[in-house]
Structures are given as structure tokens and as C-alpha cells.
């Protein structure tokens, strides 16, 4: 009998000058980047939290705490691969992921397919198992004022097929 589990993830980071902007493992052209202990890739972080949440495994802060210097500047794709391994060790696999990135700028449409490709490769799944959408916050709140970028993700995990 097939079992399914669903997880939800969210992340937000502040935009600051002199940092690269990385979303979904792709470096984007922008004047500012996201501030964080790792590469601050909010999309990948939201996906990791959704995957971990689906199996009640906590959140990324539990596995990759910002207080631990080994994760300083870490590539979030490396962290995502570790999360994927945790899931596989427990007999689960990704059914699909649906994510939304919320940013006023830069416009994300040209980057969405490369992000899907990169994330699918890291997770070892087909590109059509990942949906990434982009929207703005209509100039409302910290994201609307271009102070940060946020991401939401939902992940479906399957076992027993």
C-alpha cells in the first residue's frame, strides 16, 4: 500500500549589498543578495523545510544550525542533497514539489526553468516533479519594500510503491 506525507516550508531573508543572489541553486543578476549564514537560498531552504516537515524531522536549523561554523557560506544544494538522503534512508521519495518565490525584483521568469533543472538534479527527480512560480507582494510589507525575498514550498512524499 502506498503511503503519502505532505510538508510545508517557508523562508525569508534580508536583501543586502555585496552578496550574490542565489535562488534554487542559480545565481541571479541583481544589485543585492540575501543575507544568511549559508548562501541564504530562500527557495531551497523552503523546499528543505517542506521535505523535513513531511516526515516530522524538524527543520533545517536542526540539521544545519547557523551557530555551527561548518555551515558558514554553505551551498544550499549540498544541504538539499543531505536532506534528500535522509528521506531516502527512511524509505521515502519525492512525489512532487510546488513552490512560490515572492520578490519585487529581479523579475524571476527567465530563471524559473534553470532553477527547476538544478533542484531536480540535486534531488534526483524529474523536472516535471517540481513547479516554481514567482509573484510580487504588490509593494506591501518588507518584501514589497524590496527589503527581502521570501519563498513557500509544499512537498509530497511517497513510500511503499
Curated annotation (Swiss-Prot):
Which reaction is the catalytic activity of this chain? 4-CDP-2-C-methyl-D-erythritol 2-phosphate = 2-C-methyl-D-erythritol 2,4-cyclic diphosphate + CMP
Q: What class of enzyme is it?
A: lyase
Q: Which UniProt keywords apply?
A: Isoprene biosynthesis, Lyase, Metal-binding
Database matches in InterPro entries = MECDP_synthase, MECDP_synthase_CS, MECDP_synthase_sf
What family is reported? Belongs to the IspF family.
Which Gene3D superfamilies does the record cross-reference, listed alphabetically?
2-C-methyl-D-erythritol 2,4-cyclodiphosphate synthase
- Positions that bind 4-CDP-2-C-methyl-D-erythritol 2-phosphate: 11-13, 37-38, 59-61, 135-138, 145
**Which CDD domains does the protein's record reference?**
MECDP_synthase
Q: Which PANTHER family does this one have? A: 2-C-METHYL-D-ERYTHRITOL 2,4-CYCLODIPHOSPHATE SYNTHASE, CHLOROPLASTIC (PTHR43181:SF1)
Task: State the organism of origin.
Answer: Thermosynechococcus vestitus (strain NIES-2133 / IAM M-273 / BP-1)
Which SUPFAM superfamilies does this one have?
Answer: IpsF-like (SSF69765)
User: Pathway involvement?
Assistant: Isoprenoid biosynthesis; isopentenyl diphosphate biosynthesis via DXP pathway; isopentenyl diphosphate from 1-deoxy-D-xylulose 5-phosphate: step 4/6
User: Quick one: which residues bind a divalent metal cation?
Assistant: 11, 13, 45
Q: Which residues form a coiled coil?
A: none
Its job: Involved in the biosynthesis of isopentenyl diphosphate (IPP) and dimethylallyl diphosphate (DMAPP), two major building blocks of isoprenoid compounds. Catalyzes the conversion of 4-diphosphocytidyl-2-C-methyl-D-erythritol 2-phosphate (CDP-ME2P) to 2-C-methyl-D-erythritol 2,4-cyclodiphosphate (ME-CPP) with a corresponding release of cytidine 5-monophosphate (CMP).
GO biological process assignments: isopentenyl diphosphate biosynthetic process, methylerythritol 4-phosphate pathway; terpenoid biosynthetic process
**EC number(s) per entry:** 4.6.1.12
Under what name is this protein listed? 2-C-methyl-D-erythritol 2,4-cyclodiphosphate synthase
Q: Where is this site: Transition state stabilizer?
A: 37, 136
Named cofactor requirement(s):
a divalent metal cation
Cofactor binding note: Binds 1 divalent metal cation per subunit.
Amino acid at each position: 500500500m502506498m503511503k503519502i506525507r505532505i510538508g510545508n516550508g517557508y523562508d525569508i531573508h534580508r536583501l543586502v549589498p555585496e552578496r550574490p543572489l542565489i535562488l534554487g541553486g542559480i545565481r541571479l543578476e541583481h544589485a543585492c543578495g540575501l543575507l544568511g549564514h549559508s548562501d541564504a537560498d530562500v527557495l531551497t531552504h523552503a523546499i528543505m523545510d517542506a521535505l523535513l516537515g513531511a516526515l516530522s524531522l524538524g527543520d533545517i536549523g536542526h540539521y544545519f544550525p547557523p551557530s555551527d561554523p561548518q555551515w558558514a557560506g554553505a551551498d544550499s544544494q549540498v544541504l538539499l542533497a543531505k536532506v534528500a538522503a535522509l528521506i531516502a534512508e527512511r524509505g521515502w521519495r519525492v512525489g512532487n514539489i510546488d513552490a512560490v518565490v515572492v520578490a519585487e525584483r529581479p523579475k524571476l521568469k527567465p530563471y524559473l526553468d534553470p532553477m527547476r533543472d538544478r533542484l531536480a538534479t540535486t534531488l534526483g527527480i524529474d523536472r516535471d516533479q517540481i513547479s516554481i512560480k514567482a509573484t510580487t507582494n504588490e509593494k506591501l510589507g518588507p518584501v514589497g519594500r524590496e527589503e527581502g525575498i521570501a519563498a513557500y514550498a509544499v512537498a509530497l512524499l511517497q513510500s511503499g510503491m
